From Swiss-Prot:
The gene is Fra10ac1. Interacts with ESS2. This is Protein FRA10AC1 homolog. The keyword Ion transport does not apply. Keywords: Acetylation, Nucleus, Phosphoprotein. The lineage of its organism: Eukaryota, Metazoa, Chordata, Craniata, Vertebrata. Its main location: nucleus. Pfam families: Fra10Ac1 (PF09725). Residues 225-235 have a biased composition (Basic residues). The modification N-acetylmethionine is found at M1.
């Protein structure tokens, strides 16, 4: 018995239960209609362990990627090596590079350098030869720098000048011996330089500028060819060679000038005679004007002109 006037109903609970179920259906339908196609499902419960592990792995991978990007190549290499040793074992000496066969650019140039490059040398060009050829092209090959330390053994060393030596004047305005900086009394010498390079014997004519003491060292065994300035001699020779030509040119020019003078004089004479004739004619005409009045001329009338014209036609 319930306390509402002593009345009770068996259908009251069923009606209340039916209304709540309808409300639930409406809410589910509304949620289905309002959900977007790209919207993720809502977890009303605690996430599964696998889902949580995947999220953690993804976050860790993102952090590791940012960490590796911040490193340079050497730091990444050391990190990977340390990780390999930590996870798989091994010794650190196994990862050390052997530097016995390492070569710098200077070593490559020393191995492949040539005092003079020929067309045959440029046939098969490797990257080492190209590097040596590039260095050779930057050298200045007018004067040489000499090593005269073993002049008593008749052994000399020659090399081309570099840009720094060209700017400072070493080898041209200063002595070409690498251990001498004398700049007075320099002489130019031409040396037939014989050398062996890459198993081949070659010769090259080399110019040197040396002081007196270094010239004595160069010519210790036999005298080399000295290069003297031939500008004055060449000038005197050219002047002597050109003198007969100059004389002939001067004589021909005099004859031409004489001919031109004669031509000018004759032309002047003709012009003078013409001017005289014109002046005489003008003076005659002026004198005739002042002699008296002009004679009267009878002008024919138009009829008389017609009569004369027709008379000539009918004759």
């Amino acid at each position: 018995m319930h306390g509402h006037g002593g009345y009770d109903s068996d259908f009251s609970d069923d009606e209340q239960g039916g209304g709540s179920s309808k409300k639930r259906k409406k809410t589910v339908e509304d949620e289905l209609l309002l959900t977007k196609p790209f919207q993720k499902e809502k977890y009303g419960k605690v996430a599964h362990k696998q889902v949580a592990a995947d999220l953690l792995d993804r976050e860790e991978a993102r952090n590791r990627r940012f960490h590796l990007i911040a490193m340079d190549a050497y730091q990444r290499h050391t990190k990977f090596v340390n990780d390999y040793i930590l996870y798989y074992g091994g010794k650190r000496e196994d990862f050390k590079r052997l530097g016995e066969n390492d070569k710098t650019d200077l070593d490559v140039i020393r191995e492949n350098h040539r005092f003079l490059w020929n067309e045959e040398d440029e046939a098969d060009m490797t990257w080492e030869k190209r590097l040596a050829k590039k260095y050779y092209d930057k050298l200045f090959k007018e004067y040489c720098i000499a090593d005269l330390s073993r002049y008593k053994e008749n052994k000399f060393g020659f090399r081309w000048r570099i840009e720094k030596e060209v700017i400072s004047g070493k080898g041209q305005f200063f002595c070409g011996n690498k251990c001498c900086d004398e700049k007075e009394g320099l002489k130019s010498w031409e040396v037939n330089f014989g050398y062996t390079e890459h198993g081949e014997k070659r010769n090259a004519l080399v110019k040197l500028r040396l002081c007196q003491e270094c010239s004595f060292k160069l010519n210790f065994h036999h005298r080399r060819k000295e290069i003297k300035s031939t500008k004055k001699r060449s000038k005197t020779k050219t002047e002597s060679d050109e003198s007969p030509h100059k004389n002939s040119r001067s004589s021909s020019s005099e004859e031409a000038s004489q001919g031109k003078d004669e031509g000018h004089s004759s032309s002047k004479r003709s012009e003078d005679s013409r001017n005289r004739n014109a002046g005489e004619e003008d003076s005659a005409s002026d004198s005739e004007l002042w002699k008296g009045p002009l004679p009267e001329t009878d002008e024919k009338s138009q009829e008389e002109e017609f009569d004369d014209y027709f008379q000539d036609l009918f004759l």
